[in-house]
Amino acid sequence: FDRMSKIGPCVSIFGSARTPEENPHYNLGVDLAEEPSKRGYGIISGGGPGIMEAANRGAQKGVGQSVGLNIDLPFEQNHNPYIDSAHNLEFDYFFVRKVIFVKYSQAFVALPGGFGTLDELFEALTLIQTNKIARRPVVLVGKDYWSGMTDWIQKTMLDAEQNISPSDLDLF
């Protein structure tokens, strides 16, 4: 907490570790991180490759703070070279890492990803929905990618089952 408290306002960017550099989503991740970084926001990613690397790369291009919240996994997750050395944090548990994502971010951006991306996204949405954290922007990038999920949320969770409120659709 002490290291993060010195960074200032941040934007968290979620996305797949498996996205290669030649994928258009990678370049979009770089661009999306660069803009808030130029405006003084730190960029927080999961610290790994793929979209996470793209986010940290964009943070460095924008000369902002580049933070990586790396998780110790038996496969796939090594920290990327675009994290500021003072802001490369290592975690053993996902729930602790998610606390840091949520506590220090003023906005959340989700690019295409897998189960980890969904876990981070729904953690943020749930905490906003239940007023455990203040309302802040949650942006889903890539309409084609997310439309199946957002349609399901509306048609199944809201319309068919009434498991969420109509206002919950305004969270993202």
Where are these regions (language model features)?
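Glycine-rich beta-alpha loop segments
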Residues: 1-69
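Residue-level signal for short, function-critical loop segments
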Residues: 17-19, 113-114, 144
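Alpha-helical elements of the RecA-like P-loop NTPase motor core of helicases
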Residues: 53, 119, 147
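Short, solvent-exposed amphipathic alpha-helical segments in soluble enzyme
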Residues: 60, 123-128, 154-158
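Active-site/ligand-binding-proximal alpha/beta "capping" segment
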Residues: 92-141
